[in-house]
């Protein structure tokens, strides 16, 4: 592979070099024709301007090595092997954990569940407090509520707390 890459970079370098020299010769020949046509007597001035033009071209042309480095294409390493080994190791860890968990007695399992409880489980937001209070008012603490059956014969005491709205007043929601 390294031979292919070096051959490819050498080829691109030669192509770039020929393009650069071709552009320089074209600009020199066209400028020399124009200068000879317009200025027959100023040969010395032409040579000086050509030299300064060449110096300017050399400064504008980037180094050949920099251009070769820009055209180098590196092949990406395949990550499929890494992914498969990672997933198999996770699978092995999960199966070992499940086996150990099945061997443990129920008291130990309960301790594990309590240990892995989230610290935010015990925190109660104001919204959830209001919801719990409303549930207690609607359904009572001791009654078991079946969410599949709707009971429309609830207490009327809960309705008395509602705010009465006058029909004459306009409310914007």
UniProtKB/Swiss-Prot annotation:
UniProt entry tagged with the keyword Phosphoprotein: yes
Pfam families: Spo12
Residues modified to N-acetylserine: 2
Biased composition regions of type Polar residues, renumbered to the chain: 1-12
Name of the featured protein: Sporulation-specific protein 12
Residue ranges, annotated region (Negative-charged tail): 159-173
Misc note: Its negative tail is functionally important. Present with 937 molecules/cell in log phase SD medium.
Function: It is required for meiosis I chromosome division during sporulation. A component of the FEAR (CDC14 early anaphase release) network which promotes CDC14 release from the nucleolus during early anaphase.
Region (Disordered): 1-56
Name of the gene encoding the protein in the UniProt record: SPO12
GO biological process: meiosis I; negative regulation of protein localization to nucleolus; positive regulation of exit from mitosis; sporulation resulting in formation of a cellular spore
Residue numbers carrying Phosphoserine: 118, 125
Keywords: Acetylation, Meiosis, Phosphoprotein, Sporulation
Entry keyword annotation includes Acetylation: yes
GO CC annotation, single: nucleolus
Organism from which the protein derives: Saccharomyces cerevisiae (strain ATCC 204508 / S288c)
């Amino acid at each position: 592979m390294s031979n292919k890459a070096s051959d490819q970079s050498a080829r691109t370098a030669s192509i770039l070099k020929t393009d650069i020299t071709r552009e320089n010769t074209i600009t020199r020949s066209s400028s020399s024709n124009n200068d000879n046509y317009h200025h027959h007597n100023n040969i010395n001035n032409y040579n000086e301007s050509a030299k300064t033009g060449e110096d300017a071209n050399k400064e504008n042309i980037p180094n050949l090595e920099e251009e070769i480095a820009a055209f180098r294409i590196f092949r990406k390493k395949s990550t499929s092997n890494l992914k498969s080994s990672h997933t198999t190791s996770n699978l092995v860890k999960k199966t070992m954990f499940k086996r150990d968990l099945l061997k443990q007695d129920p008291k130990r399992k309960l301790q594990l569940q309590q240990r892995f409880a989230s610290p935010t489980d015990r925190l109660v937001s104001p919204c959830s407090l209001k919801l719990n209070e409303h549930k207690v008012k609607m359904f009572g603490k001791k009654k078991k509520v079946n969410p599949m059956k709707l009971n429309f014969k609830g207490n009327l005491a809960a309705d008395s707390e509602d705010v009465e709205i006058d029909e004459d007043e306009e409310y914007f929601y």
